Amino acid sequence: YSIDEHRTKDLFFGSIFGFIYITVLISFLIRILYFESESENQFHGAYYIIFLLIVTKFSDMGAYLVGTLIGKNKMIPHISPGKTWEGFLFGCLTFAVGGGAIFYQIFQEKMLHLSWGDVLLLGLILAPIAAVGDLAESIIKRSLKAKDSGSILPGIGGILDLIDSVLFTAPILYLYLYFFS
């Protein structure tokens, strides 16, 4: 019986990384969900999560839409060949701030910890972080020589493809709420 030491290390560290990457980062969604309003002892965390999802997903959609329409300059073609600087700068940031602002306008009374300035700043902060999350998942897929992270959702690329950017933006929103609200 022989043990392939290199493969064993890869499997071990891959398992540890997978655990940390998914469970630790996604746990911030639970922290946001139960983020308490000090003045009323109420939980409005679901509104913050919806805000996060809108900003993050509008960022992804805006980058894709603008990048597809006018994108010419590839961001990092060896990692994610479809991403362009035009999509990132114009689509990602505009859609993230716009989506967040629209949601905040509708549910402002439930989001006691955020002001208009916070919403605009978070849109500008979370949009690039969402892109980093998407690129990080692309790096993982490239290293595994996989096009998609799974086959459960045909045409979308897998569940990890849906939550990759949220995994990175959730901790940032939680820390922002914790330290600045």
Go through each PLM region and give its residues.
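Acidic (Asp/Glu-rich) catalytic motifs at the cytosolic membrane interface
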Residues: T56-K72, I76-P77, W85-E86, P128-T169
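C-terminal halves and exits of single transmembrane alpha-helices
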Residues: Y1-I3, V166-I172
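Membrane-embedded alpha-helical bundles of polytopic integral membrane proteins
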Residues: Y1-I125
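Juxtamembrane boundary at the C-terminal end of a transmembrane helix
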Residues: Y174-S181
